[in-house]
Regions:
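A conserved acidic beta->alpha catalytic loop
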Residues: 24, 31, 39-48, 68, ...
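Catalytic core of nucleotide-sugar-dependent glycosyltransferases
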Residues: 191, 199-206, 212-238, 252-280
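Membrane-interface aromatic/basic loop that binds lipid-linked glycans or pyrophosphate carriers
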Residues: 260-314
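Short, well-formed alpha-helical segments that are part of the catalytic scaffolds
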Residues: 13-27
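Glycine-rich, basic loop-to-helix element that forms the pyrophosphate-binding segment
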Residues: 65-81
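Acidic helix N-cap motif at the loop->helix transition within catalytic regions
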Residues: 17-19, 44-52, 94, 98
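Short aromatic/hydrophobic "clamp" motif used to bind/position activated sugar donors
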Residues: 86
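Donor-binding/catalytic cores of nucleotide-activated saccharide
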Residues: 70, 91-194, 201-218, 234
Length: 314
């Protein structure tokens, strides 16, 4: 008998895509699935759609709750999930038929607490899937660094052992970077992780993209998570060079986001980001980064307008 996999789907204002999402999960080639639909107080037809799916398929369980955001909905799902492994899907998205068979196979064959895959982005329709190369990490520092860097922080591209998650939950105070923080905390309990570069998840980019919906709170949240990770004991264990590289990588990403969205026009916000970049600069220049990245960091720190004006025109 396959190990039970609980898949948690937060549902809010997703009536356009919800049926597609649910159908893609229930038609998985992996045989032992529990689907937890968490209606996060959705004001549209989603609550009734969730109940309808539960009546049609015994594998579907439904939670109705007051609206409090995706993190709260995921946490409610985690509290109900009874599987030995857990996955997450966003209600606007869908998955390939063999996604969970592939992830669970990689997890079980490698005794991995986390198993991930690549994904398609609807804003980049010409992407093709990779050949399915599998990378297995078993060194603790490598696993923590993988999560700490923030480059692979989407929880919907992975399955996790319930044992590794334990009592860890999503931080409901964050409006962004909650996936990143969750992955980092779980990574402390991961002995082995396995990743395939095969794209098995379909991410639906909203017309009003994240960039256009950014605000200072979201970027400050990301920086707060960065500071927490770099300041934590596990973050410090990565070494000064690794930590300096991660810190500057995220700060420059935040700077670019703020430029594209125009948030950096707020003087206090720009001062705060520049202050943090300058504070991180000395360590970054000595961490072995490429000359191109070092020059870019210096421009951000001391000549912000040289970069911000062209960025806004893109």
């Amino acid at each position: 008998m396959d190990k039970l996999l609980s898949i948690i789907v937060p549902v809010y204002k997703a009536e356009k895509h919800l049926d597609r999402c649910v159908e893609s999960i229930l038609s998985q080639t992996y045989g032992n699935i529990e689907l937890v639909l968490v209606d996060d107080g959705s004001p549209d037809a989603c609550p009734a759609m969730c109940d309808s799916w539960a009546k049609r398929d015994w594998r579907v369980r439904v939670i109705h709750k007051k609206n409090n955001g995706a993190s709260s909905a995921r946490n409610a799902g985690l509290d109900m999930a009874s599987g030995e492994y857990v996955g997450f899907v966003d209600a606007d998205d869908f998955v390939e038929p063999d996604m969970y068979e592939t992830l669970m196979k990689n997890a079980l064959e490698n005794n991995a607490d986390r198993s991930g895959c690549g994904y398609f982005d609807s804003s980049r329709p010409d992407e093709i899937s990779a050949d399915g190369k599998i990378t297995v990490l078993s060194d603790k520092n490598s696993i923590i660094a993988y999560s700490a860097c923030g480059k692979h922080n989407n929880v919907w591209r992975s399955v996790y052992s319930k044992k590794a998650i334990g009592k860890i939950r999503f931080d409901e105070s964050l409006v962004i970077a909650e996936d990143w923080l969750f992955n980092y905390e779980v990574s402390k309990n991961v002995s082995v992780q396995a990743d395939t570069d095969k794209r098995l998840y379909h991410y639906e980019s909203a017309p009003d993209s994240l960039m256009s919906r950014l605000n200072d709170k979201k970027i400050i949240d990301r920086i707060s998570v960065l500071e927490y990770i770099c300041g934590s004991e596990c973050g410090k264990s990565l070494g000064r060079k690794e930590t300096a590289d991660i810190r500057m990588r995220v700060l420059m990403f935040c700077a670019e986001e703020s430029m594209h969205s125009g948030i950096d026009r707020e003087p206090w916000f720009k001062r705060e980001v520049i202050k943090k970049i300058r504070g991180a600069l000395a360590a970054f220049l000595g961490c072995g980064a490429s000359a191109k990245r070092k020059i870019k960091a210096i421009i951000f720190a001391f000549a912000w307008p040289l970069y911000s004006a062209p960025a806004r025109r893109k």
